[in-house]
């Protein structure tokens, strides 16, 4: 899938789930389940409840996403 097809949105981490999954509330109010991208996992970037994150969503399934950036 081409990178242009992904939808990037800002959100806040609501809770931490097992296997590096997170429940994220997007700015528009939707709640999605997201996992950490490979580069964030490789560089040991920690994500805690309440962190502001950027989530990539695919147009095919808007209930799942990938966390690609953690804001300070």
Curated annotation (Swiss-Prot):
Localisation per UniProt entry: Cytoplasm
Pfam families in the record: eIF-1a
Record has Protein biosynthesis as a keyword: yes
Keywords of the record: Cytoplasm, Initiation factor, Protein biosynthesis, RNA-binding, rRNA-binding
Disulfide bonds: none
Domain of life: Bacteria
InterPro entries: NA-bd_OB-fold, RNA-binding_domain_S1_IF1, S1_domain, TIF_IF1
Domain (S1-like): residue spans on this chain: 2-72
Gene3D superfamilies linked: Nucleic acid-binding proteins
GO molecular function, one term: ribosome binding
GO cellular component: cytosol
Keyword flag Nucleus: no
Family affiliation: Belongs to the IF-1 family.
Family matches, as PANTHER family: TRANSLATION INITIATION FACTOR IF-1, CHLOROPLASTIC
NCBIfam families given in the database record: infA
Chain's role: One of the essential components for the initiation of protein synthesis. Binds in the vicinity of the A-site. Stabilizes the binding of IF-2 and IF-3 on the 30S subunit to which N-formylmethionyl-tRNA(fMet) subsequently binds. Helps modulate mRNA selection, yielding the 30S pre-initiation complex (PIC). Upon addition of the 50S ribosomal subunit, IF-1, IF-2 and IF-3 are released leaving the mature 70S translation initiation complex.
Subunit structure: Component of the 30S ribosomal translation pre-initiation complex which assembles on the 30S ribosome in the order IF-2 and IF-3, IF-1 and N-formylmethionyl-tRNA(fMet); mRNA recruitment can occur at any time during PIC assembly.
Official protein name in the record: Translation initiation factor IF-1
Chain's gene name: infA
